Structures are given as structure tokens and as C-alpha cells.
């Protein structure tokens, strides 16, 4: 198993290029099930979650070729309608194949993601939506089975904003009979990217990026060529890496408008951000100011940037309150940050971070994807050496992050434990 060794205290400088979006690529790949044809996607990141999605689709019968960051998917040979537990258990997003398989074959059987309590997770919103469109859904032995000769358009109002649910039902509705209206839909840029792909295939979709999406079902969809949008969470992570080290970094291939809430808070903290000629320059101050954040659905502050922002606030002047309003149990990085000498207390969904003068490198353990990133950031800004174990989480969502940081002057290397 690999670990990262970081010798902190170096100001980052230079240029870095953001990879394609993981969270956009996963549903886009799944959407090709709807269109028996050859498809081509560029700017695809090389990540573990991408490989898992590819394995799921190959298990269904798709032929997939990769060449660098270009992936070609031939879905004409898909002849199975079941996604088994051995693959789905490793990634919750795999459940998105249910709707497209149901649309194509009239039947689909997909394992529930590992540790997924139906009532507590938004997957119940996916199933309620498919049922509203006429699907007969049964749960047994850890599998969801759905049947429908023809999905029919419906008006669906989500109880809470759900990115996966919005993506799932938008795909299912693309070839349903009649009009589907999704109300209280999620507004994330990744949903807009998926809608653009479906529209290129021939779907009729209006309103993606707003809270009301209208889909007028068509009989069939065709092949598509598409360049994946940049990963806004990776971009945000590099912005904080520049800020926390007092560095000066230029970031290429990012869309700053997708990170308005983060940009506002970073500027509030004293970070200088300059957007010129599609290159974003981030200059960190000698000492950041404390800033309160509350995670919200897009366009609010992204929950996927909460852990990284907390790492920054560990060195701020003053105290900040960080409220997590999207997910439960998303403070698992707190105990590890405290090993660096951070002063953090939690109560319910709020963490109070009192800035300290310095952090000291420590052996720490990654608990999830974004928590892993927060530990790297803390390590970059720490005295001494930091060792981060269980970094396989990182490989789910960051493409070659240690190489990119090393290119900015960080003393960081991946070694085998």
C-alpha cells in the first residue's frame, strides 16, 4: 500500500493544469448506455472511479478503449441488464446505470451500493422518481430490480437537492414517452455537462443548471463526441494549496465561475485571485484571515471543498466556524488535522477552528477522498515531515496530484509502505 511523504514549508509557485472532471465523467459514461453507438470523450481523468465505471460497463457488454485522456465507448454490444455487487460496492455512482438500462431493455437489476441505507441516502429519491415514471421496483437480497415496458414522462419534485438523482432521472427521461419535469433539481455544472452530452446525442432538454429541468423524450439517441469539463474541486484544491503555503500559482484549464462561493471566501480570507486570459493566478498572504463557511448545494459553498478550507483555517488569524449542511459524518478529517497541532472542536454539524501559529508534520491516515486532500494541504504548510497513509482514497478523485504539486515546488513523494 502506498503512502505520501511531505516535507513542508515550501511556498508553491509555477503553473499547474487541472484535469477533466471526475464527477462529470461518471454519469456521462453511463449515459452512453442509452445510445447503442460509438462515442468518444477527451480530457478524461485517469482515476480509480473512472476505471470502476469502465469495468461496470464492460461487464454489461460495452467495448471500451483508452488512449491517454481519450476514451472510446462502443455500447452497441451491451446485452446484459445487471450490475453486480462486486463492482457496485466500490462506488455509489454505479447505481446510475439502473435508469439507462431500464430505458434500453425494459428491465434492470443493480446491486445496492455498499453500506447504503435506503432511507438515509438520496438513492430513495432515484427510485421514487423512476416509480413515478411507471417503473415497477422491487428490493430483494441487496438488489434493486426495475421493470417497465416504456417509461413515461412525469412531474417529479425532489424532497431535497440531489445531484445523482437529477442526473439519473434526466437520463431515464431522455427516451421516455412524453415530457418529464424535474423540480427542485440540482444545479451543479456537472449536470449541465451531462445535459449537453445528451443534447448532442439528440435529447431534448431545457433548463439544466436551474432548479426546473424539462425533458421531452425522444425515440432514440445517437453517437457523441465530447470534451469533459475541468474538475472544479481539483481546481479549488490547488487554489487552497497556493493560499496555505503563501505561494503564487497559475492554474490552467479551470472555469472560475464554477467556484464563485469558494473564490468569495478565499478573497475574504485575504487571498489574491486574478483571472486573466483563462489562467487563474492565486497569491497567498503571509497570514490568512479567519472566515466562516456553510456548505450548501450549488451555487453555495461546495461540501467537497469543506475539508480543504478547514485545513486553511487551521493557520488563520482568529477563529472560524465551519458548518456542514450536506452530509453527515463529514468531519472525519478533524482528528487527523489535530495531529498537526490544529485547534478544532466540533458540535453537531459545526466545527470551530481556532487558528494556530504553525502546524507540525505528523503521521496521519486518510479517511476519504476530500479528507485526504486536506491532510496534504496541512502537510505542505507544516514544519517537519508528514506521512499520509491509506492514500488509495486520493486515487479515486485526483489525477497525479503528487506529481502536479512537485511541479509547483512541493517536496512530496509517493512510496510503498
Swiss-Prot record:
Its EC number is 2.5.1.7. Keywords: Cell cycle, Cell division, Cell shape, Cell wall biogenesis/degradation, Cytoplasm, Peptidoglycan synthesis, Pyruvate, Transferase. It is an enzyme of class 2 (transferase). One of its GO terms (biological process) is peptidoglycan biosynthetic process. Pathway: Cell wall biogenesis; peptidoglycan biosynthesis. The modification 2-(S-cysteinyl)pyruvic acid O-phosphothioketal is found at residue 116. Its main location: cytoplasm. InterPro entries: Enolpyruvate_Tfrase_dom, Enolpyruvate_Tfrase_sf, MurA_subfamily, RNA3'P_cycl/enolpyr_Trfase_a/b, UDP_GlcNAc_COvinyl_MurA. GO terms for molecular function: UDP-N-acetylglucosamine 1-carboxyvinyltransferase activity. It catalyses: phosphoenolpyruvate + UDP-N-acetyl-alpha-D-glucosamine = UDP-N-acetyl-3-O-(1-carboxyvinyl)-alpha-D-glucosamine + phosphate. GO terms for cellular component: cytoplasm. SUPFAM superfamilies: EPT/RTPC-like (SSF55205). Phosphoenolpyruvate binds at residues 22-23. It is found in: Cytoplasm. UDP-N-acetyl-alpha-D-glucosamine binds at residues 92, 304, 326. Pfam families: EPSP_synthase (PF00275). The active site is at residue 116. NCBIfam families: murA, PRK09369.1. Belongs to the EPSP synthase family. MurA subfamily. Cell wall formation. Adds enolpyruvyl to UDP-N-acetylglucosamine. This is UDP-N-acetylglucosamine 1-carboxyvinyltransferase. The lineage of its organism: Bacteria, Pseudomonadati, Thermodesulfobacteriota, Desulfuromonadia, Geobacterales.
